Structure formats: C-alpha cells, structure tokens
Regions:
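N-terminal strand-loop element at the rim of the active site
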Residues: 6-13, 26-68
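A conserved mid-protein helix/loop that constitutes part of the nucleotide-sugar donor-binding site
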Residues: 14-22
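Short His-centered aromatic/hydrophobic patch
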Residues: 91-97, 115
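Nucleotide-sugar donor phosphate/pyrophosphate-binding loop at the beta->alpha transition
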Residues: 71-73, 110, 117-133
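Active-site proximal beta-strand in glycosyltransferases
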Residues: 3, 88, 104-121
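An amphipathic, basic-hydrophobic alpha-helix
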Residues: 63-89, 98, 130
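Short, charged/polar "capping" segments at the starts of alpha-helices
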Residues: 43-48, 98-99, 121-123
C-alpha cells in the first residue's frame, strides 16, 4: 500500500512531527507500506525527529499570496499525486489548505484528515450569550 502524507513541515519540535515519525516507521516496519511525505520544509531542511530512511520525501515551495498560493499548491500536489499514485492520502495540516485538499484533488484517492492538538489550549467562551447556551 502506498500512503501519501501531507504536512506543513517536520523540521520543528512538535506533536505532528513526532506522531508522523512513529506512525510511518510502524507502517514501514510492520506492514511494508511505501510511505511518501509531502512537506513545505523550505528545501529539504533536516527533520527535527528521526524518520525511517525508506520514506520518500517531496518538498514543495510556497508561491504567491492566497489565491495564487492555493493554485500553486494545487498544481504541485496534483503533480506529486500523479507521480506517486497513492492508495490513500493522509492530511495532517489543519490550515486552510488542509481542508481544501479534497476539493483540490478530486476523487482520485481516499483522503483522511488527521488532526493533532492539545487539550491544554486555552479556549475563550463565546462573547454572545445566545451562542454559549
């Protein structure tokens, strides 16, 4: 099975990078999966955590502002998908482009949205009383 992970970057300490390193290593070691990771690591900067050497990396550039950036992201994403031909695409990016992936790629592969967060984030209550009931 071929997996394509879409993540913003893995060159900083954080939960997404650590979970991704652990999960992808498990998939490769125990199931023999072929794992590809697409990042925006600014030219293949060294990942913060150690990743399995069998992972195939795809680094893309951020180009333009908002609409032009989304269009450039779509073109680069489609190129990588056509090269890799993944069985599943896992999106671990909770930014706007992460939510847009299913619309950007069409129906070629199943898309799984994986979100990592912390229960220790300070949440503010709604300021409108009718919304906080």
């Amino acid at each position: 099975m071929k997996l394509l992970y879409l993540v913003p970057s893995v060159n900083q300490a954080g939960g997404v990078a650590k979970v991704l390193a652990t999960k992808t290593d498990y998939f490769i070691q125990n199931f023999g999966y072929e794992v590809h990771i697409m990042t925006q690591n600014k030219g293949y900067e060294t990942p913060f955590f150690e990743f399995n050497a069998q992972i195939v990396w795809h680094d893309i550039e951020r180009k333009g502002h908002f609409l032009s950036a989304i269009y450039a992201y779509k073109k680069q994403l489609q190129t990588i998908i056509s090269q890799v031909q993944p069985d599943s695409i896992i999106v671990a990016d909770n930014g706007l482009k992460g939510y847009l992936v299913p619309f950007l790629i069409g129906k070629n592969s199943p898309v799984i949205f994986e979100c990592h967060g912390s229960k220790y984030v300070n949440e503010r209550p709604f300021t409108f009383s009718f919304l906080s009931r």
